[in-house]
Swiss-Prot record:
Single GO MF annotation: nicotinate-nucleotide adenylyltransferase activity
Function: Catalyzes the reversible adenylation of nicotinate mononucleotide (NaMN) to nicotinic acid adenine dinucleotide (NaAD).
Pfam families: CTP_transf_like
Organism phylogeny: Bacteria, Thermotogati, Thermotogota, Thermotogae, Thermotogales
Highest taxon of the lineage: Bacteria
Natural source organism: Pseudothermotoga lettingae (strain ATCC BAA-301 / DSM 14385 / NBRC 107922 / TMO)
Family matches, as PANTHER family: NICOTINATE-NUCLEOTIDE ADENYLYLTRANSFERASE-RELATED, PHOSPHOPANTETHEINE ADENYLYLTRANSFERASE
UniProt keyword annotations, A-Z: ATP-binding, NAD, Nucleotide-binding, Nucleotidyltransferase, Pyridine nucleotide biosynthesis, Transferase
Pathway: Cofactor biosynthesis; NAD(+) biosynthesis; deamido-NAD(+) from nicotinate D-ribonucleotide: step 1/1
Similarity comment: family membership: Belongs to the NadD family.
Protein name: Probable nicotinate-nucleotide adenylyltransferase
UniProt keyword annotation of Transit peptide present: no
HAMAP family per the UniProt record, alphabetical: NaMN_adenylyltr
Length: 197
């Protein structure tokens, strides 16, 4: 059993990981006072992506992008095999640390949370933390009606709006536009080479 007791989980495809992800991780650690934040790249996303980079490449990029004494890059979802469902990741780290973890996701995810695998079980087994994205929350009323009493348990992270997205980075590469400053300098060349294919 691990003795660290304030644990965060920041999962995603990280396709590719970018500076926005790094900012989010730093704010989460500071504002939630986390002892440890796990960065957990998705192995097989529930919703298939045609341009998903191989897990090993995304994992390597995450190790370069995220660093610090309170961060650990986890390959749990690869080791588990199969489709990566957030609930099982939360349950794994909850059992590992004997604590209720903080699960961090983007504000835009709330618009379709009812499509997540056993989403009510997920919300009941973690502190569900949402960071702001560049959107106007047109779905807030819909989300409240879906989650009902669980909506009030959501923690909204007070952090700067993130104007960078992985899909925008991939699009810019296809259009031969610069991504300088959007990803870690040490992975920029590899990211451009991979998504240019």
């Amino acid at each position: 059993m691990n003795t660290k007791n304030k644990i965060g989980i920041f999962g995603g495809s990280f396709n590719p990981p970018h500076i926005g992800h790094l900012i989010i991780s730093q704010y989460a650690i500071e504002m939630l006072q986390l002892d440890l934040l796990y960065i957990v790249p998705t192995y097989i996303p529930p919703h298939k992506s045609n341009d998903l980079a191989p897990f090993e490449l995304r994992f390597k990029w995450c190790k370069i992008t995220f660093s610090g004494p309170h961060i650990s890059i986890s390959d749990y979802e690869k080791n588990r095999q199969g489709i990566s469902y957030s609930l099982y990741t939360v349950l794994y780290f909850s059992q590992l640390h004997r604590t209720k973890p903080y699960f961090i996701t983007g504000e835009d995810s709330l618009s379709y949370i009812q499509n997540w695998h056993k989403y009510r079980d997920l919300l009941e087994n973690c502190h569900f933390v949402v960071y702001p994205r560049y959107c106007n929350k047109p779905y807030e009323e819909h989300t409240r009606s879906v989650l009902k009493e669980l909506y009030d348990s959501i923690i909204f992270l007070q952090a700067p709006l993130i104007q960078i997205s992985a899909s925008d980075i991939r699009k810019r590469i296809k259009e031969r536009k610069s991504i300088k400053g959007m990803v870690h300098p040490q992975i920029e060349k590899q990211v451009i080479e991979y998504y240019s294919l």
